[in-house]
Amino acid sequence: MEQKILDCTLRDGGLVNRFYFTDDFVRGLYQANLQAGIDYMEFGYKASEALFDRREFGKWKFCREEDLRAVVGDNKTSMKISVMADVGRTDYSKDILEKKDSVIDMVRIAAYAEQMGEAMEMVSCCKERGYETSVNIMAISNNTDEEIDRALETVSKSRADAV
């Protein structure tokens, strides 16, 4: 099994500061990750603007293409760009573009064990659009071993690239 390093500083930190990071800070972190040899940098969420008010959150809650490109350009580097998309909080059919039109390389789909069906629909949609995908099973410590096994079995039968 090949291991890759994913930096989720922005996405995780955004939970504390409502995703209000300056472009200079984000550029600095991007450059630091490049120098450190990080494989993937997760910028934030692809959250639905129908569910979340842009006036209450910084731009990294939504990771619009123009905001990403303002920091990374065309990202002509070996580091891949990732975003997280939560089941039920992303309008993935609208918010996730075709890969050919995006600087994003991987969509990390976050779901609770009982949401694996919808998560697999998101995986399929993202794969059809040309993205790498990963599934993040949330709050897994609240699940029984059987629930975890079922969720992992579902993911293993999907087109997801990683868990």
Can you say where each PLM-predicted feature lies in the sequence?
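Short, small-residue-rich loop/turn micro-motifs
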Residues: T9, Y45-A47, R159
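Short, intrinsically disordered, charge-balanced linker/junction segments flanking boundaries
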Residues: V155-V163
